[in-house]
Amino acid sequence: MAEVSSKELYKFKKTLKELSEKKGRGTELVSVYIPHDKQISDVGKQMRDELGQSANIKSKQTRKNVQSAIEVIMQRIRLFKAAPENGLVLFVGMIPRGGPGTEKMETYVFEPPEPITTYWYQCNNEFFLEPLEYMIEERETYGLAVIDRKEATIATLRGKKVNILNHLTSGVPGKHKAGGQSQRRFDRVIDLAAHEFKKRIGEHMNEDFLALEELEGVIIGGPGFTKEEFVKGDYLNYEIKDKIIATVDTSYTGEFGIREVIDKSADILNDLDVMQEKKVVQKFLHELVKDKGLASYGEREVRTNLIMGAVDTLLLSEDLTAMRKVFKCPSCGNEEEITVKSQSEADKLEKPCSNCGEILKEESSQTLIEDFVEKAEEMNSEVELISTETEEGMQLLRAFGGVAAILRYHVG
């Protein structure tokens, strides 16, 4: 996705998760996507048309709620002369808090992290989030090839987008029925032609894949043994060969074969993300057991090292639920930062000011993850958000409180 900060990405993912949990009673949640080049005046006209169309909705309550949502959208878009560079997204609708009659109008308006290319208007019982969810998908580039003796297809996979780079045909002759020396001679011709074809495939793969800045891995498929011969042979540049992560059997070649490779590699590609998480946690654990190792853990210790500029990579569990709050003294203005497990804990907190003894009042709040990510960006520290899908991820959360760091230098 476009270059955004770790904090912005975390907040965007958090917003999407919250929006995905919003459900309406009927098809009354309105989603609007406005590309940058779409005239706001045109959107306003379309909203007026939709307002008129909504009069045909049979359910009185749904009709009223949809019309209210459209009116809110019309009010909001009047505040814009033009859509921002990446476009504008609006989610508006009545969200129930409990039983009937508890609905409240909720409005979300923001610029997404990547450009919107298509105008959308949709009413449903949930917000339409697919275009935004696509933006946050991991979209590393993978090289793909399907090979047999007759043809080869070379492609890349980035997110859900497949790009066919090359399709080659071999001209390798089929089986020959002659016997004796003629048969042996013909077999040698076939083997030489097959070898030359594999050389040609390798040259094209080297040219196509070495030009890619971020090639995460290469997967090679095909219906016969040619793919194994190709992988074992000396046909690829060592940089490409070292990135082969799997070979898979397919029934087809060509574009159908590429699609089959993708389908059969879904688990492999998913495991690569998990392996990256495991790798960074294992690096932390390795530093932890060394004398004067470059490891730190626990909220207080990591925070201190982060502020000092000693943290190279910050490891945070995605399952951290704690909050970081700023409390302010109403008398002397003294501010103190406190970490709490939940909002209910903060509500019960009666902490006296360290200066004058007056009870502190909550001033601002954010999640502990947001707080740490913000500080990491200020100190140019890398941030790794670790899921609990692996044993290492669970260990980070349970044994180290979900907060750890790999240091730039040893802190005495």
UniProtKB/Swiss-Prot annotation:
Compartments, as annotated in UniProt: Cytoplasm
InterPro entries: eFR1_2_sf (IPR042226), eRF1_1_Pelota (IPR005140), eRF1_1_sf (IPR024049), eRF1_2 (IPR005141), eRF1_3 (IPR005142), Peptide_chain-rel_aRF1 (IPR020918), Peptide_chain-rel_eRF1/aRF1 (IPR004403), Ribosomal_eL30-like_sf (IPR029064)
UniProt-recorded Gene Ontology molecular function terms: translation release factor activity, codon specific
Pfam families xref list: eRF1_1, eRF1_2, eRF1_3
SMART domains with a match to the protein in the record: eRF1_1
Alphabetical UniProt keywords: Cytoplasm, Protein biosynthesis
SUPFAM superfamilies assigned: L30e-like, N-terminal domain of eukaryotic peptide chain release factor subunit 1, ERF1, Translational machinery components
Keyword Ribosomal protein: no
UniProt key word Cytoplasm: yes
Superkingdom in the source lineage: Archaea
GO CC annotation terms, alphabetical: cytoplasm
Subunit details: Heterodimer of two subunits, one of which binds GTP.
Recorded family membership: Belongs to the eukaryotic release factor 1 family.
HAMAP family: Rel_fact_arch_1
Entry-linked NCBIfam families: aRF1_eRF1
Function text: Directs the termination of nascent peptide synthesis (translation) in response to the termination codons UAA, UAG and UGA.
Name the record gives this protein: Peptide chain release factor subunit 1
Gene this protein is translated from: prf1
